[in-house]
A protein has these predicted regions:
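PP2C/PPM-type serine/threonine phosphatase catalytic domain
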Residues: 1-252
Length: 252
């Protein structure tokens, strides 16, 4: 499998509240994570970094996961533990009150992906010239779209586009979306924060993923394009490709 991770502060924010990375367990299986933090007094970067570090540590101590069912159970259990950690930290530290983070976590197996997510960081799968968003945003505008009160086109420019219905760490309990999908030779996957998807359309993401360029080059071009269009937010993404080759690891 080829894989690449990149995070960028963007051109406007004073610091990077995104976090993420690619990590291996004891059986050399890969976990990918992206978290987009929120909260005043720089607490957003505390929340996202806490979640990233938690998943990195527990995954690196984990033995082989053999089935999607096992992966989903692992993900749900650790999302709940990470939520408790962030919520309690915010309760105990006044400067962190109200902090939280989106999170999307992917476990890669030979022919399956198991995914857990909360918030509006997204996962897309590119397969045979088709790009599919395989996560649902936990956002106000997405709820309005789903209920027929707003068109998908109008949602892109809605003034409350960034209002989340669900985030990790803002409440004592949280219910993540957890599911598995097929992962086959030639597939490409992207998980990303909204600093990317607020600047690049789904069609543009598809066009990038359809090229024969390396994942490193694709990722850097995406980040550069998002910054060229204003770069008002932090930009974070992890790319993966189902292939025999190995490529890259991570960059900041």
């Amino acid at each position: 499998m080829k894989q690449y991770f990149i995070t960028d502060q963007g051109k406007v924010r004073p610091h990077n509240e995104d976090a993420g990375g690619l990590f291996k367990n004891k059986a050399d299986q890969t976990l990918s994570i992206v978290a987009d933090g929120m909260g005043g007094h720089q607490a957003g970067d505390v929340a996202s970094e806490m979640v990233k570090t938690y998943f990195a540590n527990v995954w690196e101590a984990t033995e082989r996961i053999a089935t999607p069912e096992e992966a989903e159970a692992w993900l749900k259990s650790h999302i709940l533990k990470a939520n408790t950690n962030v919520f309690q930290h915010a309760e105990q530290n006044p400067e962190c009150r109200g902090m939280g983070t989106t999170v999307i976590v992917v476990i890669f197996m030979a022919d399956q992906l198991s995914i857990a997510h909360i918030g509006d960081s997204r996962c897309y799968r590119y397969r045979e010239d088709d790009l599919t968003q395989i996560t649902d945003d936990h956002s106000l505008v997405n709820e309005l779209v789903r209920s027929g009160q707003l068109s998908k086109q109008d949602a892109e420019y809605h003034p409350r586009k960034n209002v989340l219905m669900k985030a990790l760490g803002t409440n004592p309990l949280v219910e993540p979306d957890v599911f598995s999908v097929a992962w086959q030779e030639g597939d490409r996957l992207i998980i990303c924060s909204d600093g990317l998807t607020n600047k690049l359309t789904d069609q543009e993401l598809k066009d990038y993923l359809a090229t024969n360029e390396s994942l490193r080059d694709i990722a850097k071009e995406m980040v550069n394009e998002a910054n060229d269009r204003g770069g008002e937010d932090n930009i974070t993404l992890a790319l993966a490709e189902h292939s025999e080759a190995e490529e890259g690891d991570a960059t900041c």
